[in-house]
Amino acid sequence: WCMPGGKMAVYTGLINQIKPTDDELAAVIGHEMAHALREHSREQVSQQMATNIGLSVLSAVTGAGATADLGGALSKVMFTLPNSRTHEAEADRIGVELAARAGYDPRAAVTLWQKMGALSSGSAQPEFLSTHPSAASRSADLTAAAAKVMPLYQQAAGK
């Protein structure tokens, strides 16, 4: 995952479970680098602060904590989750390009997320309730993104 300040961490447990190829690991690292480059963490903190202020004002005006609770739930489904999925899709696209420019096969991002999807099969929730795109959406988007950056990969890899 990516943390504020551009630091990254990769779970060794995940590495041990999916046993990624070098190209797949480059897809993970590229994805996390993209989050740092686009400052997604900073944006999420700012949005959360604005949401909390708005909910506090709403609660104070209405005098009802339940209103703020409902507002928080609606805000999450209508703004926070879709924005998080947008960040994930953007990080996927940029990450694939970064990996390709470094000489790693961008098509490996598709196989990586297929492996990840297999780990969580049966526990997937509807996309609109998730912080991440669905496996089907992600696979389609990554396939298209990989095709676009194949020339960069071929140039970087000398193919």
Predicted regions and their residues:
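A Zn2+-metalloprotease active-site environment signal
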Residues: W1-K159
